[in-house]
C-alpha cells in the first residue's frame, strides 16, 4: 500500500495585478502640464477647465496651475486647473 497521499491540484491562488487607480494630485496642489491628476474607471470625476481626459478616462493637466475640485449640478464632480 502506498504511503503518500494523492497530490490534488488547486484551482485557486491567482489574482490580477492592482491597477493603482485613484487621485494622484490632490486639491490645492500644483500640477505641471501633462501630469496625471486622477486614474479612474469610468467618469467618476469629469474634466473641467484646463483638464484633459484620456481614452481610459484618466484626467490630466493641460496647463501648469493649482488643482481645484468642485461639485456641480446633479452631483457631478469636476476637476479644474486654476492658473496663477
UniProtKB/Swiss-Prot annotation:
NCBIfam families: L27. GO terms for cellular component: cytosolic large ribosomal subunit. Keywords: Ribonucleoprotein, Ribosomal protein. It comes from the Bacteria. Residues 1-21 are annotated as: Disordered. Coiled coil: none annotated. This is Large ribosomal subunit protein bL27. GO terms for molecular function: structural constituent of ribosome. Belongs to the bacterial ribosomal protein bL27 family. Signal peptide: none annotated. InterPro entries: Ribosomal_bL27 (IPR001684), Ribosomal_bL27_CS (IPR018261). It comes from Baumannia cicadellinicola subsp. Homalodisca coagulata. GO terms for biological process: translation.
Amino acid at each position: 500500500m502506498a504511503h503518500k497521499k494523492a497530490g490534488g491540484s488547486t484551482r485557486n491562488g491567482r489574482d490580477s495585478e492592482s491597477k493603482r487607480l485613484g487621485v494622484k494630485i490632490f486639491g490645492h496642489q500644483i500640477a505641471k502640464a501633462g501630469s496625471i491628476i486622477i486614474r479612474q474607471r469610468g467618469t467618476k470625476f469629469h474634466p473641467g477647465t484646463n483638464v484633459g481626459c484620456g481614452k481610459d478616462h484618466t484626467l490630466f493637466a493641460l496647463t501648469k496651475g493649482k488643482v481645484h475640485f468642485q461639485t456641480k449640478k446633479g452631483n457631478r464632480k469636476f476637476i479644474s486647473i486654476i492658473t496663477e
